[in-house]
Regions:
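Fe-S-dependent hydro-lyases/dehydratases of central metabolism
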Residues: 1-180
């Protein structure tokens, strides 16, 4: 049976379960991302696991949400995130570098890889051929510790498009039209 791109990525990352629609599967996560509004709790949970270093190929801590310093709390969180990144082998992205989900695609996105992020816009990674999902902080912490991410095997449909895009039409326009 010939697999499409999504099925190939899932198959190559499958560590538990069967690739049957809606059955529970566990997949290996290659990359994680967090942002400062959700990352602090994720890293506290990761630290509680006692794992000496992240076990993903790449994990990035972005500071892009709570960048205004109206009191000490944000600055304390930012220092904590920076220290966790250094201690456990994460990349730290300072305030002002950009928005996590877009920046991650531009700098670290790799087609064929899996990405789990504690930001609801993480699925934008699908646009470059990644299996890319948003999740809670504990799920991201478990992925950084080398544990599989569990989900129901999605229903995968094939879409065949013919022709050429008109001027000023992009891939995003195509997907928005398909979803309408």
């Amino acid at each position: 049976m010939a697999y499409n791109v999504s099925e190939k990525i899932i198959s190559s990352h499958l560590v538990e379960g069967e690739m049957q629609s809606q059955s529970l599967i566990g997949i290996r996560i290659d990359q994680t991302l967090t942002q400062d509004a959700t990352g602090t709790l994720a890293y506290l949970q990761f630290e509680a696991m006692g794992v000496p270093k992240v076990k993903t190929e790449l994990s990035v801590s972005y500071v892009d949400h709570n960048t205004l310093q109206t009191s000490f709390e944000n600055a304390d969180d930012h220092r904590y995130l920076q220290s966790v990144a250094k201690k456990y082998g994460l990349v730290f992205s300072r305030p002002g570098n950009g928005i996590c989900h877009q920046l991650h695609l531009e700098r670290f996105g790799i087609p064929g890889k899996t990405l789990l992020g504690s930001d609801r816009h993480t699925p934008t990674g699908g646009g470059i051929g990644m299996i890319s999902m948003g999740a809670g902080g504990l799920d991201v912490a478990l992925a950084m510790a080398g544990e599989p991410f569990y989900l129901k095997m999605p229903n995968i449909v094939e879409v065949c498009l013919d022709g050429e895009l008109s001027e000023w039409t992009s891939a995003k326009d195509v997907i928005l039209e398909l979803l309408r």
